[in-house]
């Protein structure tokens, strides 16, 4: 049975009832800070589209935001991969002999940073002639203290690390497939005045290049004149190859009455004009370059139904209360 047929039956039932009753994820592009040391790097995320055999220079500012301590920093090259579907990356050490380790050459591998001061770390990215097309993921890491955990005077000293993430894509023929894995609301039927809406969607990629999704979400039955237009990827988040990334938004109800209002949890709250009765489409599109470098567009859609049954219940209770008060008061007035 299609949603339209369900909608028509529910709408008919709702009209009958109404008659009777009278009635919201990265890599985040924020500077990363060590847990207790106040060491900050910026920019925290860098992108490079590179030619084979070319060299590129970058500068990362390493800031000591502590009031008293001076730190000696070591420059390291690590890699990172997708962690959770919420976009938290996992930084991993490169194994000995990994060629990517040699792509980065620091002008100064070790340096000191005084309190409330900073140091500009300059390094070059040298892309080998034989590098294969595709994306490479480098974590330019700065570490305080020794290279290993040591025990001194019964105290364990562990180095602190902070990293700037570098996305390198070597030009050439790449492989990329993109699709919506999921696109759905927490339910299909809502009271437009009292129920919160939660939309969750997941985008997946396959191939050898990362993706920064571009596109929009349109709320409304006419995509040319939508009730709301929302960014598909509001934080410019990245999706690494062969992984999924979860997104979503919430729209909270306008009325707040105990026992009736049902709010939803989510980090991204948006404003949507809901019809008081009927159906409403939510459509999303994503635009990306395919393996041939041509722009491709994919679209997905869901539909929700609004029935103001809770408002009808409020009206029914109000009418019943008024009627009860009238019949209680009527004998008294009759005697008078």
What is each stretch, according to the model?
Residues 57-63, 70-77, 89, 101-154:
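Ligand-binding face of N-terminal immunoglobulin V-set domains in extracellular IgSF glycoproteins
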Residues 42, 53-59, 119-121, 133-139, ...:
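Short, solvent-exposed loop/turn segments enriched in Ser/Thr/Gly
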Residues 38-42, 87-109, 221-235:
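Short beta-strand and strand-turn-strand segments in soluble, beta-rich domains
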Residues 297, 301-336:
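C-terminal single-pass membrane-anchor helix
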Residues 173-310:
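Membrane-proximal extracellular "stem/stalk" segments
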């Amino acid at each position: 049975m299609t949603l339209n047929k369900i909608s028509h039956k529910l709408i008919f039932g709702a009209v009958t009832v109404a008659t009777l009753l009278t009635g919201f994820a990265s890599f985040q592009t924020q500077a990363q800070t060590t847990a207790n040391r106040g060491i900050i790097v910026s920019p925290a995320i860098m992108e490079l589209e590179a030619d084979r055999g070319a060299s590129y220079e970058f500068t990362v500012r390493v800031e000591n935001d502590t009031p008293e301590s001076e730190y000696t920093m070591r420059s390291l090259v690590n890699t990172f991969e997708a962690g959770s579907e919420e976009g938290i990356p996992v930084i991993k050490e490169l194994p000995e002999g990994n060629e990517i380790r040699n792509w980065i050459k620091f002008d100064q591998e070790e340096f000191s940073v005084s309190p409330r001061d900073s140091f500009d770390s300059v390094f070059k990215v040298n892309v080998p002639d034989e590098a294969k097309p595709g994306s490479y993921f480098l974590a330019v890491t700065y570490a305080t203290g020794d290279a290993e955990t040591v025990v001194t005077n019964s105290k364990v000293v562990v180095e602190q690390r902070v990293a700037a993430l570098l996305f390198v894509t070597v030009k050439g023929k790449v492989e990329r497939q993109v699709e919506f894995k999921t696109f759905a609301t927490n339910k299909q039927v809502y009271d437009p005045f009292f129920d919160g809406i939660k939309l969750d969607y997941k985008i997946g990629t396959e191939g050898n290049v990362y993706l920064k999704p571009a596109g929009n979400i349109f709320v409304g039955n006419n995509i040319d004149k939508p009730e709301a237009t929302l960014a598909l990827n509001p934080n410019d988040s990245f999706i690494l190859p062969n992984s999924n990334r979860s997104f979503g938004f919430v729209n909270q109800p306008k009325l707040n009455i105990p026992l009736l209002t049902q709010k939803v949890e989510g980090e991204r709250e948006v404003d949507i004009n809901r019809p008081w009765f009927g159906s409403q489409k939510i459509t999303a599109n994503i635009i990306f370059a395919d393996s041939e470098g041509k722009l491709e567009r994919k679209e997905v859609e869901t539909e929700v139904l609004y029935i103001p049954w809770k408002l009808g219940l409020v009206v029914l209770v109000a009418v019943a209360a008024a009627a009860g008060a009238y019949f209680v008061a009527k004998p008294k007035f009759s005697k008078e």
